[in-house]
Amino acid sequence: MARDVLTDLTKVRNIGIMAHIDAGKTTTTERILYYTGITYKIGEVHDGAATMDWMEEEQKRGITITSAATTTFWGDNQINIIDTPGHVDFTVEVERSLRVLDGAVAVFDGKEGVEPQSEQVWRQADKYEVPRICFVNKMDKLGADFYYTVRTIEERLAAKPLVLQLPIGSESDFQGVVDLVRMKALTWRGEVKKGEDYAVEDIPAELADEAAKYREQLVEAVAETDEALMEAYFGGEELTEEQIKNGIRKLTINREAFPVLCGTAFKNKGVQPMLDAVVDYLPSPLDVPPVQGLLPDGETAAERKPSTQEPFAALVSKISVHPFFGKLTYVRVYSGKVSSGTQVINSTKERKERIGKMFQMHSNKENPVDEIQAGHIYAVIGLKDTTTGDTLCDPQNPIVLESMTFPAPVIEVAIEPKTKADQEKLSTAIQKLAEEDPTFQVKLDDETGQTIIKGMGELHLEVLVNRMKSDFKVEANIGKPQVAYRETIRKTVEKYEYTHKKQTGGSGQFARVIISLEPIEQSADSATYEFENKVTGGRVPREYIPSVDQGAQDAMQYGVLAGYPLVGIKVTLLDGQYHEVDSSEMAFKIAGSIAMKEAAAKASPALLEPIMAVEVTTPEDYMGDVIGDLNSRRGHIQAMEERSGVRVVKAQVPLSEMFGYVGDLRSKTQGRANYSMVFDSYAEVPANVAKEIIAKATGE
């Protein structure tokens, strides 16, 4: 039976489960749902039966693709959980879930320690200042090493681990944990009723010294949070359990340290103490600073406190298509409350919206609620023009909350429907999937008439194409993956003048613009473009300025070298001229567009390609072959290190050189090496390679 949403926000936790692919996130979430009483049968990822992996694609692959949201209770506390994907191609899901969370559980593989994707997700959580606790999972795995994993958290993430538990036994002999706060042993003997019952015992004699050492470090870290505690500690007083817990909570919420616990979710050991830690140490909506935003003027800062007494404000974190309700919009409510049927304003797009039915979600099942209120995550239906990152708020007290930034797609494929009937279904499928996923983009190739879909990697596009088949019944042919190149400029062009004039009977067209172009720094997660207006004395009327901006942006879509989108450019409108009768928005848009294109051709244009951060794990014997192969792919070796008896090579390699790498690596190392790859940045293509790419793109 669904319980009501808690209004006492001190007892609410909005958390995410984040990790590298295969570290055991979904299994951990499943166990949480089981122990908190929502699922009555434990779902296993291996069987394709996990509750949170509700899309057919996820169940088939055993990985999480979209961040399912679920609400559950632990004791008298409410935990809203988002299970995020760990595969690099689905960064957008991680990004948008972290934006609306207050805290997270970072799950690590007890044998592998910090892996490349865990590092990337950790950095994303740093960006949104999310407090975390760490759960070292898979302690029953052959080669699991708790202390090694703690070391990698410190070294690779430059984070301060705060060890709260030590493992009792390891690998197949892993029996439980030493709780350093209570100084007791918690043991799970055998497979007792799915691990629900655990014994609280004295610490085994052989672990007493180790436990005392780590307890000392813990108490010292806690004492440093408060002068009174520091005096008591150095005065030889024992700190109480409550004082220690309060100190850990303070360190965690301030992100000065990250509590580390351990267990094995698959074998049902260590999950309940981890849930206790979520409640004890992660922040409630009241512990995080008020959410920041801007008033509609776009300049005045404003904030909303997490209270139902404040005006309503919510951020849209995700859109998904539901088989019965159609468009489901997930929102994190930061302040105020609204009931069904209320009119709100989408302040990002300045559109009115009416909220229809509202639900508290459990994976893909829904519990209807009468009102949505501050501090919680819900799904609502009935919103027409709202997309991910938009703000919904009280029409009388508008605010625009900080949105999310999503990386530009790096790979594209052509897609062709097999029949005329598929053509219509394909358009619907593409529109719905693009609504759900901001990193999935579509364009029509003007020359070939083909539909091109773009995404974050081969797996990302493969999953989307398979969803078109399963969810929308579209049959389509898919082309070979292509790299999403970009173009940029290398030098500044001052005062470039263009006049657009047309006289064909009746009123003509007239617009003169003088612009400058300059290269600007590009960030990994946005295709940068800036526009500045420096026109004085009304030489270009104010109502035409946005048209020049729009024209320049239109021209950015097709670069001058090979027709790839332009990035990293600042356009400044310096001066211009207009005609009382013949000038129009359209005339200035055309002038802005052509001026931009012609000026870019004079600004030393260059071709850019996506560079991937590649990490290869290989036995020592194949090290030479692996490095030689990466060098032959125009790779730059960044670092080499030893990790758990194998060698790790880190390199930066152009994406265009990485197609088919998985097969080549397998054959070179007899299948003993593996690799991971994440998008790093865009970089200039060497001249000899660029020449070939441009010739191919322009058909020369």
Swiss-Prot record:
The keyword Ion transport is assigned to this record = no
What the entry lists under PROSITE patterns is as follows: G_TR_1, G_TR_2
Highest taxon above the source species: Bacteria
Can you say where in the cell this protein is located?
Cytoplasm
What InterPro entries does the entry give?
EFG_II (IPR041095), EFG_III (IPR009022), EFG_III/V (IPR035647), EFG_IV (IPR047872), EFG_V (IPR035649), EFG_V-like (IPR000640), EFTu-like_2 (IPR004161), G_TR_CS (IPR031157)
Which GO biological-process labels does this protein carry? ribosome disassembly
Q: Which SUPFAM superfamilies match?
A: EF-G C-terminal domain-like, P-loop containing nucleoside triphosphate hydrolases, Ribosomal protein S5 domain 2-like, Translation proteins
Q: What is its main location?
A: cytoplasm
Q: Which UniProt keywords apply?
A: Cytoplasm, Elongation factor, GTP-binding, Nucleotide-binding, Protein biosynthesis
Q: Name one GO cellular component term.
A: cytoplasm
Stretches assigned to the tr-type G domain:
10-286
Disulphide-bonded residues: none
Residues in coiled coil: none
| GO molecular-function term, one example from the UniProt record | GTPase activity
Q: Name one Pfam family in it.
A: EFG_IV
Q: Which NCBIfam families match?
A: EF-G, PRK12740.1-3, PRK12740.1-5, small_GTP
Report the family membership. Answer: Belongs to the TRAFAC class translation factor GTPase superfamily. Classic translation factor GTPase family. EF-G/EF-2 subfamily.
Q: Which HAMAP family match?
A: EF_G_EF_2_B
Q: What is this protein called?
A: Elongation factor G
Organism listed in the record: Saccharopolyspora erythraea (strain ATCC 11635 / DSM 40517 / JCM 4748 / NBRC 13426 / NCIMB 8594 / NRRL 2338)
Designated gene of the protein = fusA
